[in-house]
């Protein structure tokens, strides 16, 4: 997905992803349900907090250049109470690891997500 084609908004991208998951689940529920159970278990509170797990997931999303997951986990970080500074610091760690690709996503997509998601709380 190109940065300029964000379905007109970050929330639009999240909605598009949820629609896709719904369609996928309808077609092959046994795989979707197993995958969803696995990911839910991974993000439960444990030795790491849910908040720490979201920050890690955001960093991985940036390093792998996965824009849907970057948006999803930026929202997850906000939902878990992370500050902008904490989010950007985690992004900085990802940039140190992954280099320029992560930094370019941080200075554009993540900052846009922070602005839009915080201004459109449900």
Pin down the residues of each PLM region.
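Polybasic, low-complexity binding patches
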Residues: 84-88, 121
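Alpha-helical scaffold segments that form or flank carboxylate-/histidine-based iron centers
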Residues: 53-61, 90-95
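Amphipathic alpha-helical segments within well-ordered protein domains
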Residues: 39-40, 57, 74-78
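Residue-level detector of well-ordered alpha-helical segments, enriched
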Residues: 51-55, 69, 86
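C-terminal structural segments of small proteins and small subunits
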Residues: 88-112
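Short, thiol/selenol-centered motifs that function as redox-active sites or metal-ligating centers
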Residues: 56, 60-72
């Amino acid at each position: 997905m190109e940065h300029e084609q964000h379905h007109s908004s970050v929330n639009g991208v999240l909605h598009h992803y949820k629609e896709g998951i719904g369609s996928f689940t309808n077609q092959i529920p046994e795989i979707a349900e197993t995958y969803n159970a696995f990911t839910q278990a991974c993000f439960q509170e444990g030795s790491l907090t849910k908040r720490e797990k979201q920050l890690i997931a955001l960093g991985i999303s940036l390093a792998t250049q996965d824009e849907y997951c970057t948006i999803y986990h930026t929202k997850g970080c906000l939902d878990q109470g992370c500050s902008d500074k904490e989010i950007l610091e985690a992004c900085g760690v990802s940039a140190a690891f992954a280099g320029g690709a992560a930094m370019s996503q941080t200075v554009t997509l993540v900052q846009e997500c922070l602005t839009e998601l915080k201004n459109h709380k449900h």
